[in-house]
Amino acid sequence: MVVGGIVGWEEGQDDLFNPLSPRNRDDCLEPFRVLRAKAAERGIELHTLDVLEKTGITPQFNLYIESLPLIPINNCKNYLIRFETDLTVPINGDADYLNQFDGIFTWDTVLLSKNSENALNQKTASTPKFPLAYPNVLPAAFQLNQIVNLGFAGRDLFCVLIGSNRHANLPDARELYSERVKAIRWFEANAPGDFALFGNGWRVPQKRLGKSGKWRYRLEKVIPFLMGKAVFPSYRGAAKSKFAVLSKARFCICYENARDIPGYLTEKLFDALFAGCVPIYWGEPNIQEIVPSNCFIDFRQFVNRSNPYQDLYQYLSKMTEEDFIAYQEAGKQFLASPAFRPFSSEAFAQAILGPIQS
């Protein structure tokens, strides 16, 4: 029996594989349960590293699911799942850190390319890299080839945004954290009745980099407090279930944490499609080659206009129910097609286990 350790799940105690874990919102941990089950079929036993340490078992390999300092263990290979960009996790752009691993699983097509002139690619050329798409979990209420709340009926929320109030950790024009805030502020000022914000951390302003950013943060926090107003008036609290919220919404702003990074496609667009909600997407530069363009609204069509959110709002407001259903139908067809399979939990497990066993 081959034994592997999981490093980076702060709860430890195999909580990563527990469907009843309080962190398992919308069953987001399913990919790791599938990974464990598929590993067992291949004679591999997976546990979080703390469990192995308590039982005195030395793993043959460790799989890092967060970018943490490498733990040296004799005769143990180490693999990294590089989930985030270096804008959010700066160490993911550190060649010295990446080169410590025996292999890196990543969606980053630039890093995966053998002919890229990218500096990080060249500095890590000797480290094996394996393609891995961000996994997406089908909600329990989702049924293949069916659309929940077809059309406008049952969708009392016009437009929503679900996400945590975070910021980039490196200055970079590609970050979209601040663009989310622009969208929120526009709707709050111009169409407050047609917008709702969900997620964590929105009772305070968005944090910013640098000294001037810190002063701006303090002012944006203090002034609403003194005036007895909410920092973000559209905030409705955390979404206990994204599917429950999105199945009641017509549109959802689905911006990645950063744009124009090839391969960087996370759960945001898929969460909306599962719920029959039309995504307003910005992020992966080649998204139309991955997800059919009739499934979503590409915000790049509006971004260079003089008033992008006004034009977007007019487009959304004038959309007929027939056109809305066409978006829903296109999303349904994509999710039922082979094109979605690379983004499933099963594909995630197979993409990891193949290289580990080779």
Predicted regions and their residues:
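Nucleotide-sugar donor-binding catalytic core of glycosyltransferases
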Residues: 1-295, 336, 341, 345-356
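Short, hydrophobic alpha-helical segments
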Residues: 316-320, 352-358
